[in-house]
Amino acid sequence: PIAKAAAQQALLLDNQLAEAHISFASILMLGEWDWENSGNEFRIGIELNPGYATGHHWYAEWLLFHGRATEGLQEISLAAELDPISTAILKDQGMAFYYTRQYDKAYENAIKTLELNPDFITGFRLKSLSLQATGKFEEAITANEQWGKLTGDPVKTELSLAHIMATAGKKEEALSMTRAIVADQKLGNNDYRSIGQIYAALGNIDEAFKWLELSYIRREEALCNMKLDPKMDPLRDDPRFDALVKKIGL
């Protein structure tokens, strides 16, 4: 509410300020899932200042949330051209490659990001995801451990490891890890979505949707990636998948 009020106040003072429109759009998108108005605000901001890299960066997220992969890639690539040394943009361009199954390009962006900043937390996350997607599980685990050391969040690190184990065929180990985390009752933001994805990888579709519904109730930001996220692939043929996408408003 404070950030939204600040953005609205900035627009009242100067409604030609591109940065204010972009900030307001991001709040509407991630904080309220107001897709129509956030999209309008992004487009206004970009029209006011086409050279504002952050505008193209965040609008790319909006497009990718909607499954508009080609347009999303174009926007994030434009952001990278405008600000080639932004680790956040490089990482999210890598995530766009990941969402569009261009895993080698995703890995390249992870390496570029970490070359610019060796301690950039989500650079290791992107590296782990891209390695996992290409079946390089041991390397993915190493990158996941590096990510976990920097985040200081053992729950997210363990959930990510459990998903790697599930996709590597170590299903009993993955299930045991997941049940232990749930029993510990220390779940945080986006963890319910992660558990749903683990159960999807394990082939337990009913349990997966149970956790994704809990993620929806908690309005977890990461759930908005479900239209393109490869980890959702085991669920796409189930009618509950499209029903959940519709509930989110995408």
Where in the sequence are the language-model features?
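Flexible helix-coil transition and linker loops at the boundaries of alpha-helical arrays
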Residues: 8-17, 51
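Alpha-helical protein-protein interaction modules
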Residues: 1-8, 22, 35-43, 52-57, ...
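N-terminal/domain-start segments enriched in small and hydrophobic, helix-friendly residues
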Residues: 47
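Periplasmic c-type cytochrome electron-transfer domains
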Residues: 25
